[in-house]
Structures are given as structure tokens and as C-alpha cells.
Amino acid sequence: MGAPTLPPAWQPFLKDHRISTFKNWPFLEGCACTPERMAEAGFIHCPTENEPDLAQCFFCFKELEGWEPDDDPIEEHKKHSSGCAFLSVKKQFEELTLGEFLKLDRERAKNKIAKETNNKKKEFEETAKKVRRAIEQLAAMD
């Protein structure tokens, strides 16, 4: 019987899992932002057609793109999301106590809810603008 695996929601806490997301990452050897260093800084690679180097912190959900070979992932993370609790964790995942892990997971869940709420708010605001324009166009017809 093999070692138990973590539920998918917790796998990003593992550095090896984060490294595995960096397929087709443009910066490998001789660069500051290698997959290993990106993963150490908490990033996962989530490329899109228009943003092939898009990376997101699995913890605070901050997305960064436009990476340069000499960008330091930790410094970029601190610069763009200084309040990310992952940056202050001094232990490897495997060294955390259950209490420490659950506290981190609760913080991550709050971050995820905040990100999703913000996305829904933006989506609603965009829809509201379109509806307002349509109403104004209808009113102008009279």
C-alpha cells in the first residue's frame, strides 16, 4: 500500500505539486524565475493563450505575468502581495503541526472567497454598465 495522497484542494501546499504545474515555462536554467524558485515563492503556473507566463500564488491568489528572466519570484510576490501569509511561513509543509496547517488553510479559504467575491463583483459591474447603456439607448429612441 502506497503513501496516502492529499485531497486535491490541499495538493498546492506541496512544493513538488506546484513545480509540476510549470509545463512549457519559458524560464529554465540561468534564470532567477525557474520553476523551482517560482514554486518556493508559492506560485503555480496557469497560462492562458494571451498570458503564457501567468503565475498565481496558490495561497493569496495574486496573479502575475510579464516575467523577466532576472525577476526574483519571492521579491515580486512581496512587492505585489506583501500581506500574503504564505510568505511568512518558515516551515516546509511536512513540518507544520496540524493546528498550524489548519490555520493556514483557513486563511487560504478566506483569500479564495475574497478573490471569487471580487471577481463576481467585477462581473456584475460590467453587466450593469451594459444594461445601463441599453436602457439609455432605449430612452434616447423616444
Curated annotation (Swiss-Prot):
Changing K129R: Loss of acetylation. Localization primarily within the cytoplasm. One of its GO terms (biological process) is positive regulation of mitotic cell cycle spindle assembly checkpoint. Changing K23R: Increases ubiquitination and blocks dissociation from centromeres. BIR repeats lie at residues 18-88. The modification Phosphothreonine is found at T34, T48, T117. InterPro entries: Baculoviral_IAP, BIR_rpt. Changing R18A: Disrupts interaction with histone H3pT3, no effect on interaction with INCENP. Changing K79R: Increases ubiquitination and blocks dissociation from centromeres. Zn(2+) binds at C57, C60, H77, C84. The modification N6-acetyllysine is found at K23, K90, K110, K112, K115, K121, K129. Belongs to the IAP family. This is Baculoviral IAP repeat-containing protein 5. It comes from Homo sapiens (Human).
